[in-house]
C-alpha cells in the first residue's frame, strides 16, 4: 500500500472564480468579484473584512445557503451550486455545521433537544439522538445545562450550546459567521478555545467570518475580503 503524502490530499472546500452580483432594475452591485480559494482539511481559517465587505455572503455560498451568480463551490469534490435544492439540503445537514453571531436556539426546546435537533431532522430516533447529544454535552463540559432552556442561559453558554449543535452530526466542515461578535472578551476566548478543542479532537475544519482581528490571529490562515476581492493576510 502506498502512503499518500499530505500534499496529495485534496482540499475539503474549493471556490472557483466566485462572482456574486445583485441585479436591480437599472443597476447592479457586485459583492464578490472572482473569488478563488482552497480550504485544507483540519484547519481553522479566518475570513476578515469590513462590515458589508461580502464575507458573510461568501460564507453563505460556501455552505450552499446562497448560489453564486457564476463560478463553482466544491465540497469534498461535489459542486454544491449544481445540486438540486433537496440534495443540497441533505449535504448541508450531513457535511456542514453552521454557527451564527446570534445562537438561534429554539426557545421552546431544552438545551439537550436543541443539540439533538439536527439528528432528529436527519431521521434518527429520539433515544439515539438524545444519547449522542448527552455525549457531546459531557465532552465539552456543559452536561449541567442539559435540561435548561435558552432563556436560562448566559450569552457564552448559549453560543457554546450552538457550537455543540453544529458538530452533533460530526460534519467535516463548520462555517461560523461572527461566532463571537455578540460576546465579551472572556466568553469570546472560551468559545474559540472550544473550537480549537473540536478541531484537535475531530479534525473538524472551521471557516470563521469575523471582524475580530485578535481571534483571526489565532487561526491557521487569514483571508481578507476587500472590494469583492480576496487575498491572504500576512498579519
From Swiss-Prot:
InterPro entries: AAA+_ATPase, ABC_transporter-like_ATP-bd, ABC_transporter-like_CS, MacB-like_ATP-bd, P-loop_NTPase
A Pfam family the protein falls into: ABC_tran
The protein's role, per its UniProt record: Part of the ABC transporter complex LolCDE involved in the translocation of mature outer membrane-directed lipoproteins, from the inner membrane to the periplasmic chaperone, LolA. Responsible for the formation of the LolA-lipoprotein complex in an ATP-dependent manner.
Gene Ontology terms for molecular function: ATP binding; ATP hydrolysis activity
One Gene Ontology term, aspect cellular component: plasma membrane
Domain ABC transporter: 13-235
Family matches, as Gene3D superfamilies: P-loop containing nucleotide triphosphate hydrolases
Binding positions for ATP per the UniProt entry: 49-56
Subunit structure: The complex is composed of two ATP-binding proteins (LolD) and two transmembrane proteins (LolC and LolE).
Membrane topology: Peripheral membrane protein
Keywords: ATP-binding, Cell inner membrane, Cell membrane, Membrane, Nucleotide-binding, Translocase, Transport
EC numbers for this chain: 7.6.2.-
Protein's cellular compartments: Cell inner membrane
Organism: Blochmanniella floridana
Protein name: Lipoprotein-releasing system ATP-binding protein LolD
Family note: Belongs to the ABC transporter superfamily. Lipoprotein translocase (TC 3.A.1.125) family.
Chief place of localization: membrane
CDD domains: ABC_MJ0796_LolCDE_FtsE (cd03255)
Enzyme class: translocase
Amino acid at each position: 500500500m502506498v502512503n499518500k503524502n499530505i500534499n496529495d490530499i485534496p482540499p475539503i472546500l474549493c471556490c472557483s472564480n466566485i462572482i456574486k452580483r445583485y441585479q436591480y432594475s437599472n443597476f447592479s452591485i457586485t459583492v464578490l468579484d472572482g473569488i478563488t480559494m482552497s480550504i485544507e482539511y483540519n484547519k481553522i481559517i479566518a475570513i476578515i473584512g469590513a462590515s458589508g465587505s461580502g464575507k458573510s455572503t461568501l460564507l453563505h455560498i460556501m455552505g450552499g445557503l446562497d448560489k453564486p451568480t457564476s463560478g463553482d463551490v466544491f465540497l469534498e469534490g461535489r459542486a454544491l451550486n449544481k445540486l438540486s435544492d433537496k440534495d443540497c439540503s441533505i449535504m448541508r445537514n450531513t457535511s456542514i455545521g453552521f454557527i451564527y453571531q446570534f445562537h438561534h436556539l429554539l426557545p421552546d426546546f431544552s438545551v439537550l433537544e436543541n443539540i439533538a435537533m439536527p439528528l432528529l431532522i436527519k431521521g434518527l430516533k429520539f433515544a439515539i439522538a438524545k444519547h449522542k447529544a448527552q455525549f457531546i454535552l459531557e465532552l465539552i463540559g456543559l452536561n449541567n445545562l442539559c435540561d435548561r432552556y435558552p432563556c436560562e442561559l448566559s450569552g457564552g453558554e448559549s453560543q457554546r450550546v450552538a457550537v455543540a449543535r453544529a458538530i452533533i452530526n460530526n460534519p467535516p466542515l463548520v462555517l461560523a459567521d461572527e461566532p463571537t461578535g455578540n460576546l465579551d472578551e472572556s466568553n469570546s476566548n472560551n468559545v474559540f478555545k472550544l473550537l480549537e478543542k473540536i478541531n484537535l479532537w475531530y479534525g473538524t475544519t472551521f471557516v470563521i467570518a469575523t471582524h475580530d482581528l485578535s481571534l483571526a490571529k489565532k487561526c491557521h490562515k487569514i483571508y481578507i475580503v476587500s472590494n469583492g476581492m480576496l487575498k491572504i493576510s500576512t498579519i
